[in-house]
């Protein structure tokens, strides 16, 4: 998801997206720990998406 798309969402939608991404990150970390994760690049993608959502949330809180 692009930052432009996130800026158009409401705060509630962004918070829901953040929770979803955190759950996905947890699942991926557990899969990596048990050796089931073949696509390790997904971890960094999810981490960056979490950072994007948090950045947009902080921008909206500042306004």
From Swiss-Prot:
| One term under GO cellular component | cytosolic large ribosomal subunit
Q: State if Ribonucleoprotein is listed as a keyword.
A: yes
A molecular function (GO) term: structural constituent of ribosome
Q: Which UniProt keywords apply?
A: Ribonucleoprotein, Ribosomal protein
The record's listing under Pfam families reads: Ribosomal_L29 (PF00831)
Q: Which InterPro entries does the protein's record reference? A: Ribosomal_protein_uL29, Ribosomal_uL29, Ribosomal_uL29_CS, Ribosomal_uL29_sf
Q: Where are the transmembrane segments?
A: none
Gene Ontology process terms (BP): translation
- What is stated as this protein's family in its record? Belongs to the universal ribosomal protein uL29 family.
Q: Which PANTHER family match?
A: 60S RIBOSOMAL PROTEIN L35/50S RIBOSOMAL PROTEIN L29, LARGE RIBOSOMAL SUBUNIT PROTEIN UL29C
Q: What is this protein called?
A: Large ribosomal subunit protein uL29
- The coding gene here is rpmC
């Amino acid at each position: 998801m692009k930052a432009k798309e996130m800026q158009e969402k409401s705060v509630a939608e962004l918070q829901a997206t953040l929770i979803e991404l955190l759950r996905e990150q947890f699942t991926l970390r557990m899969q990596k720990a048990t050796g089931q994760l073949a696509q390790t690049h997904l971890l960094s993608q999810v981490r960056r998406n979490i950072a994007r959502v948090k950045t947009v949330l902080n921008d909206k809180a500042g306004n």
